[in-house]
Curated annotation (Swiss-Prot):
Role played: Catalyzes the synthesis of beta-nicotinate D-ribonucleotide from nicotinate and 5-phospho-D-ribose 1-phosphate at the expense of ATP.
Pathway the protein contributes to: Cofactor biosynthesis; NAD(+) biosynthesis; nicotinate D-ribonucleotide from nicotinate: step 1/1
GO terms for biological process, alphabetical: NAD biosynthetic process via the salvage pathway
Protein EC: 6.3.4.21
Catalysed reactions listed for this entry: nicotinate + 5-phospho-alpha-D-ribose 1-diphosphate + ATP + H2O = nicotinate beta-D-ribonucleotide + ADP + phosphate + diphosphate
Phosphohistidine modification, residue list: H211
SUPFAM superfamilies from the UniProt entry: Nicotinate/Quinolinate PRTase C-terminal domain-like, Nicotinate/Quinolinate PRTase N-terminal domain-like
GO function term, MF aspect, one: nicotinate phosphoribosyltransferase activity
Modification comment: Transiently phosphorylated on a His residue during the reaction cycle. Phosphorylation strongly increases the affinity for substrates and increases the rate of nicotinate D-ribonucleotide production. Dephosphorylation regenerates the low-affinity form of the enzyme, leading to product release.
Record InterPro entries: N/Namide_PRibTrfase (IPR041525), NAPRTase_N (IPR040727), Nic_PRibTrfase (IPR006406), Nic_PRibTrfase-Fam (IPR007229), Nicotinate_pribotase-like_C (IPR036068)
GO cellular component, one term: cytosol
The keyword Phosphoprotein is annotated on this UniProt entry: yes
Annotated protein name in UniProt: Nicotinate phosphoribosyltransferase
């Protein structure tokens, strides 16, 4: 189900480098969230535990290290040496099942546990469809679907990346998707978040930061200072590379209130992951103009539950206003005639050092349906941020 230590999304490795550099003593706990309350089949946890144990066998090969060194110019020699000796520790993952309810937690040093989320979700997804005897569409029909999507995106000149590792139907289907898209002569695929597939198909690995980076800074520095300290720390770690900032962890309103000229010029653009995308375009364009920055020199990366029609609709509102690209996930890797799992694994708690107290980590987003974390802490965060506005 997992093919390599690099069968993971790039932003997990980039964040791991930053954590290893800046926050090596931080401990974290992640929790699996089954948003749709999907019932899991009998003995699912037992089968999942077998897959988790198998993860300890993956190591970075010399060829993979050479690939990262040549391709990912932002990865430091220190980090690559660390990753070369990294192994997954199954003891960091706790899996249990009560009737049809699945529970998964990941706990340990942040710089180690950060790599679990994506492959673990990919395993849960693929294993679920195996154990429920899901019947996907015939391969040739899936290929036609893949090609039709690629043609529409190409005809509309939409630059997009595959972001579908976490909720893919299968590893083999994921690989077939990339192969199908690349078979189209004038495709507009700019890369994939999956580092292993980027290596295999010689396309660009794509990704910067996830919500957990900013969520942690909310614990470290308080909710009002979470965004500015998170982007400043990112700049310290990468010196201007990987310059796409995520806006919605504590709402875009709060993000823009501290996204000043320095960081607006330093960062290449922002990522939209919740809320109304059209209203978001207007706000971001206006914000850059207020800072005397030409919006057409900046980029918005859209990644909020996209399908092809949504991408076309959004793109039409960006033309001649701001650059745009799209991270399309489940709609690419799990549009095979089954219902994809609606699940996430999110940072739930962290402590700044082993001797420090644990604190709840939360995310607001621009969509209340995507709020995650302890309900009391969410209410406290909202009060704190409202007082500061």
């Amino acid at each position: 189900m997992i093919q390599s230590i690099l069968d993971n999304d790039l932003y997990k490795f980039t964040m791991q480098q930053a954590v290893h550099m800046l926050y090596p003593r931080v401990d974290v706990e992640y929790e699996f969230i089954n948003r749709s309350n999907t019932p899991f089949p009998k003995d699912f946890a037992q089968r999942l535990q077998v897959e988790v144990q198998g993860m300890k066998n993956f190591r970075l090969t010399p060829e993979e290290k050479e690939y990262l060194d040549k391709t990912c110019y932002f990865m430091t020699p220190v980090y690559l040496d660390f990753l070369e000796h990294y192994t997954f520790d199954p003891d960091e993952v706790t899996v249990s099942q009560t009737n049809s309810e699945l529970s998964v937690t990941i706990k340990g040093p942040w710089y180690r546990t950060i790599l679990w989320e994506v492959p673990l979700m990919a395993i849960i997804s693929e294993l679920y469809f195996v154990m429920t005897n899901a019947r996907p569409l015939p391969d040739e029909q899936i290929r036609v679907i893949n090609l039709n999507k690629a043609k529409i995106l190409s005809c509309n000149n939409i630059r997009y990346a595959d972001f579908g590792t976490r909720r893919r139907f299968s590893s083999s289907g994921h690989e077939a998707l990339i192969r199908d898209i690349l078979a189209l002569e004038h495709n507009t695929l700019i890369g994939t978040s999956n580092v292993n597939l980027a290596r295999l198909f010689n396309i660009k690995p794509i990704g910067t930061m996830a919500h957990e980076w900013i969520m942690f800074h909310g614990v470290l520095n308080g909710y009002r200072m979470a965004n500015p300290t998170a982007v400043a720390a990112w700049a310290t770690a990468f010196h201007g590379h990987l310059g796409i900032a995520l806006t919605d962890t504590f709402t875009t309103d709060i993000f823009l209130s501290t996204f000043d000229t320095l960081h607006a010029k330093l960062f290449d653009g922002v990522r939209h992951d919740s809320g109304d995308p059209i209203a978001f375009i207007d706000r971001i364009v206006d914000h850059y103009k207020k800072l005397h920055i030409d919006p057409i020199t900046k980029t918005i990366v859209f990644s909020d539950g996209l399908d092809i029609d949504k991408a076309v609709h959004i793109h039409n509102h960006c033309i001649n206003r701001i650059r745009d690209s799209y991270g399309i996930g489940t709609n690419l890797t799990n549009d095979v005639g089954v219902t994809p799992l609606n699940m996430v694994i999110k940072l739930a708690k962290c402590r700044t050092a082993p001797e420090k107290d644990w604190h709840n980590a939360i995310k607001l987003s621009d969509d209340k349906g995507k709020h995650t974390g302890d309900s009391e802490e969410l209410a406290h965060c909202i009060k704190v941020l409202e007082r500061g506005m």
